[in-house]
């Protein structure tokens, strides 16, 4: 989540979620109008209003046509986004950078949500403070869990095999063979 400060955007997690909810509510209403217009005779097709590509994208997420990937570090943020997804009927495919995903590994597995996670990078800012080396392993090992080793740098992607080896070593350290 971003902090906008003087730029006029939300500066709290609650403000961000309020913005997301408003956007999805707008998309649901937009979708309803567009669907109603599409079911009318050809002469009334324009009653659905002007096409809005931003709302089309969110409507596509609600309809299941678009895979939703969300960037969240903290477990409480992930839980809130899962609640938002349930409220508006969309499915989250994956959380990226979820350094606290281990805290809700079983919920992620139950919801069919994957984690695209770092092997051992956390603590670089407050939102990323509570990570553990076993994060990927614990998310993946939950019944029906899904986690992949992630890198968002050109340098890190060249050594993804080494990042995966770190995950395996961390598993062995806590008694889990991979």
Language-model region placement:
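Polyanionic/metal-chelating signatures
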Residues: 1-94
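Glycine- and other small-residue-rich loops at beta-strand/loop junctions that grip anionic moieties
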Residues: 47, 70-73, 96-97, 128, ...
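Amphipathic coiled-coil/heptad-repeat helices and related helical stalk/stem segments
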Residues: 54, 77, 101, 131-132
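His/Asp/Glu-enriched, well-ordered alpha-helical/loop segment
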Residues: 67, 109, 113-178
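Active-site environment of divalent metal-dependent phosphoester hydrolases
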Residues: 75-79, 98-105, 155-157
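Short hydrophobic/aromatic-enriched beta-strand-loop microsegments
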Residues: 90-97, 114-119
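A generic structural motif
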Residues: 92-100, 104, 177-178
């Amino acid at each position: 989540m971003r902090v906008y400060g003087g730029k006029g955007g939300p500066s709290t997690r609650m403000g961000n979620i309020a913005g997301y909810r408003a956007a999805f509510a707008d998309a649901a209403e937009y979708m309803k109008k567009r669907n109603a217009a599409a079911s009318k005779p050809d002469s009334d097709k324009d009653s659905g209003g002007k096409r809005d590509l931003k709302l089309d994208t969110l409507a596509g997420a609600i309809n299941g046509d678009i895979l939703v990937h969300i960037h969240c570090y903290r477990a409480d943020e992930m839980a809130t986004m899962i609640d938002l997804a349930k409220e508006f009927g969309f499915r989250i495919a994956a959380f990226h950078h979820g350094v606290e995903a281990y805290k809700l590994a079983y919920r992620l597995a139950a919801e069919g949500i994957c984690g695209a996670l770092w092997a051992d990078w956390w603590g670089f800012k407050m939102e990323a403070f509570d990570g553990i080396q076993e994060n990927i392993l614990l998310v993946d090992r939950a019944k029906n869990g899904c986690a992949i080793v992630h890198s968002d740098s050109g340098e890190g992607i060249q050594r993804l095999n080494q990042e995966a080896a770190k995950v395996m070593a961390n598993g062995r350290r806590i008694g889990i063979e991979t």
